[in-house]
Amino acid sequence: MSKHAAVESDEHVAERTAEAARQVERLTRWHDDFPTPGVRFADLTPVFADAEGFRSVIESLAACAPDADLVAGVDARGFLLGAGVAATLGTGVLAVRKGGKLPPPVISREYSLEYGSAALEIPGNGVELRGRRVLLLDDVLATGGTLAAAAHLFVEAGAQVVAAAVVLELEFLGGRARQGDYPLTSILRLP
């Protein structure tokens, strides 16, 4: 268990998540046809900029895996989430970077996007990952490729992904089906 985390009752976790979902729903800005025509973009910036909204989201995400000993945030908004959750749990935080942003050696994984492909990376040395219990965080779960690729990186490094969590899940894109054996929590799920 993390140094500062306390195990909460399921009822308390559900209440915390419901409050965070209300904050996310209230504060998220939606943009049609951004970044390309036909895409409806969820801008979570107002959630992160609002003290109560951000606190609520961080506390909800931290409750997903109080026994994690490392929090990993996916580039780029996952960095904000990861730092807040790691501070809450008393763990370290690791940034899962887009390809080409870390010096070698790296562990890398390519994945497909709606409009092409991309890669994610974590350090290949300098951070001992073997045996670590990782909570993986991202802002939005859409098609699921990004989160699945990030999870694969940690498995390849010998770590265990004990849980993954996102602020917003776009269920109609089916991203949940691409995830591994770890529990996946979404603060707000949109059909």
From Swiss-Prot:
One of its GO terms (molecular function) is AMP binding. It is an enzyme of class 2 (transferase). It comes from the Bacteria. It is found in: Cytoplasm. SUPFAM superfamilies: PRTase-like. It catalyses: AMP + diphosphate = 5-phospho-alpha-D-ribose 1-diphosphate + adenine. GO terms for cellular component: cytoplasm. Pathway: Purine metabolism; AMP biosynthesis via salvage pathway; AMP from adenine: step 1/1. GO terms for biological process: adenine salvage; AMP salvage; purine ribonucleoside salvage. Keywords: Cytoplasm, Glycosyltransferase, Purine salvage, Transferase. Pfam families: Pribosyltran (PF00156). InterPro entries: Ade_phspho_trans (IPR005764), PRibTrfase_dom (IPR000836), PRTase-like (IPR029057), UPRTase/APRTase (IPR050054). Its EC number is 2.4.2.7. Catalyzes a salvage reaction resulting in the formation of AMP, that is energically less costly than de novo synthesis. Belongs to the purine/pyrimidine phosphoribosyltransferase family. Homodimer. This is Adenine phosphoribosyltransferase. It comes from Nocardia farcinica (strain IFM 10152).
